[in-house]
Amino acid sequence: MRLDRLTNKFQLALADAQSFALGHDNQFIEPIHLMSSLLKQEGGSIRPLLTSIGIDAGRFSNQLELALERLPRVQGIGGDVQPSNDLVRHLNLCDKLAQKAGDNFISSELFVLAALEERGTLSDILKAVGATKEKITKAIEQMRGGEKVDDQGAEDQRQALKKYTIDLTERAEQGKLDPVIGRDEEIRRTIQVLQRRTKNNPVLIGEPGVGKTAIVEGLAQRIINGEVPEGLKNKRVLSLDMGALLAGAKYRGEFEERLKGVLNDLAKQEGNVILFIDELHTMVGAGKADGAMDAGNMLKPALARGELHCVGATTLDEYRQYIEKDAALERRFQKVYVAEPSVEDTIAILRGLKERYELHHHVQITDPAIVAAATLSHRYISDRMLPDKAIDLIDEAGASLRMQMDSKPEALDRLERRVIQLKLEQQALKKESDDASKKRLEMLNEELLVKEREYSELEEEWKAEKAALTGTQHIKAELENARISLEQARRSGDLAKMSEIQYGKIPGLEKQLAAATQAESKHMKLLRNKVTDAEIADILARWTGIPVARMLESEKDKLLRMEQELHKRVIGQDEAVNAISNAIRRSRAGLADPNRPIGSFLFLGPTGVGKTELCKALANFLFDSDDAMVRIDMSEFMEKHAVSRLVGAPPGYVGYEEGGYLTEAVRRRPYSVILLDEVEKAHSDVFNILLQVLDDGRLTDGQGRTVDFRNTVVIMTSNLGSDMIQERFGSLNYDEMKDIVMGIVSHNFRPEFINRIDEAVVFHPLGRRHLSAIADIQLQRLYKRLEERGYQVTITQQALEILAEAGFDPVYGARPLKRAIQQEIENPLAQKILSGQLLPGKPVTLDVENSHIVAKQ
């Protein structure tokens, strides 16, 4: 018999049998060795063949092991192992059986038949476990499905559906799929397309996260519940596993062979299987090498003839990019568009999924949490889709709470640390013999006793609460299993079992759960097991940086005192500070228009009066950092072509992938202060872009993504009309001054731009009385730098006034003050520090001598 006539699987098993015999120190390869390796073979035919006729494969394997142990062992055979006469006889009989069946190659299942026909140990074991020639012959025919073994890889293609697909209907029967709520219209349209005679292949198209895969799972659940038309009853929904299909396909044509095996198996099922291909676009080009055919082209004939019932799912972008380009493939599919559900629909979906997440995280999810997850995610997470983003919020909030429940509560942790600290001190004091130490030791022992008692009481309480939570968890799991059993009994028509579960088991478990939940809600002092809207808001704030959580009292006070906080850094300019403060308060109180930025302001006024400083102060107030603002110098956008830098280059231009300067900054930090400095210096086309931002709080970047500006404060600064402010200051009141300046502004900016700004604020020029306060603020920064080097500096009032006088210039505002500080204070200080006249550690006073500021120690 020629070994090249064996199938690949049979050849591999023979090689394994040889190493098996070698490992057991047997001189010959016996039929038992070969049967043992065939039984252990991954993806082999023997195990499923024996299982199909009711033979326990584990018991059979044990019998073979015992027979192997009884074989004679020969030490030092040096790797020369030969097939025994018995094995050669068995293989010759396999060859005979293959020729009889009309096969070109000998497959491994014929070896079982040959073993039963021959006499020997293997034949006896097979008969002992219940194998007969008739049973095996029938099982082989069933396994082959009337096909001949015409190539060496024939065994690999068998059971292709089992290997390369996941049975969704089976998972639905076992209750492993999440419930599908709503989506009736899409499921109905999918069923309608599946009912067609030809081209009965729907493709679900929608944005990522809208629930395309869930629709197919919903279809599987409807099929097992019998809630489908006659044509779809008792059908199976199988999901194609592209990873398994491609994995390990090393040689050219191996992938195609596997896919062909799947298609052949599907053809044999005669329309009883609906194949679901998730990420359908991966089929286009899958397995394509030079000149080879890709998976998409192999599917086309089966799809066109209606032999293959297929449901695809892909996103809009990928459908356009891959499927639409292949018109022949596109026409074989019928599009079913899956839109994003509304907030109300999302709330219904979340209510349906609630129990699954409660069971997984061992927490209770309240209804306000569900409503908050849907509404807040819809408002604040703009780059993802419902219901996916809302489900993620619930999931993460549950995980966060579970993590807190599993770790030690903070109060207990604090007590434990204190006990350890006291014990360490106790050990140290025991070594001392003086009276003070003894007295301290007595006090310490008393405190330690109290703390240890407190700790043990608290620990008991914690353990009791944890046990109560675990109790409800077990009941919930039992209830879930009872409901799955009820569904299975209903489908199989077992009325006795149904009534037993429905009227006996479930009401009892529900009573237990109600009692346990009541007991749980009474005492919970250390553990929180409820996901509320506060937890959802907290998770969202962590994701986006947008403060949507309920305001703490401290934050409310801070917002009410916002003007005083800003005035610590910005001197004068009451109108500007009030306008900004009111906008932020409106936003945090939830009264601002949700479809516009928090506030948009145009700051007008001469240079050096605090326009940019107010923006920095606002960023510091909101985010505790001056750098937490997006600052764009509009003088960089003077040319028409520079405008594209804000939103990103259009397709085909260099830098298209990088995104825009403004849009990328806001995508990363949706809650920020945007400062457009010196806005009048920008090209007029920039204002066309800003119109959308100011009116709708949105902007589309170069790649077509919508960027959300609804949680930003947009501030533009300009020097327009500053000469008029300088001239008329003092002679006109604020409103008259503002009218004159706005007249100049309206000549430079278009009316539609000015009309969209919340408020234009005119800054006053700074007077002498303001300069002393500004000088003090700027000196504080210098003191901080000196403090790091060990110098404590103070300034007298007289010196401060001289400094303010030196830095006063009505035209340039507060900027000359910086130069005055450098010349009058920093330069002399630097010289004295370097020469050693000022020593660290001693206080330094800045005073006046001969009309000059001097540093003394």
From Swiss-Prot:
Region Linker, annotated ranges: 341-545
Positions of region (NBD1): 159-340
One Pfam family here: AAA
Domain Clp R intervals: 3-146
Repeat 1: annotated segments: 6-71
Protein name as annotated: Chaperone protein ClpB
Gene: clpB
GO biological process, one term: protein refolding
Amino acids binding ATP 1: 206-213
Subunit record text: Homohexamer. The oligomerization is ATP-dependent.
Annotated domain remarks: The Clp repeat (R) domain probably functions as a substrate-discriminating domain, recruiting aggregated proteins to the ClpB hexamer and/or stabilizing bound proteins. The NBD2 domain is responsible for oligomerization, whereas the NBD1 domain stabilizes the hexamer probably in an ATP-dependent manner. The movement of the coiled-coil domain is essential for ClpB ability to rescue proteins from an aggregated state, probably by pulling apart large aggregated proteins, which are bound between the coiled-coils motifs of adjacent ClpB subunits in the functional hexamer.
CC terms in the record's Gene Ontology section: cytoplasm
Gene Ontology molecular function: ATP binding; ATP hydrolysis activity
SUPFAM superfamilies associated with the record: Double Clp-N motif, P-loop containing nucleoside triphosphate hydrolases
Keywords carried by this UniProt record: ATP-binding, Chaperone, Coiled coil, Cytoplasm, Nucleotide-binding, Repeat, Stress response
Cross-referenced CDD domains: AAA, RecA-like_ClpB_Hsp104-like
Annotated segments matching region NBD2: 555-765
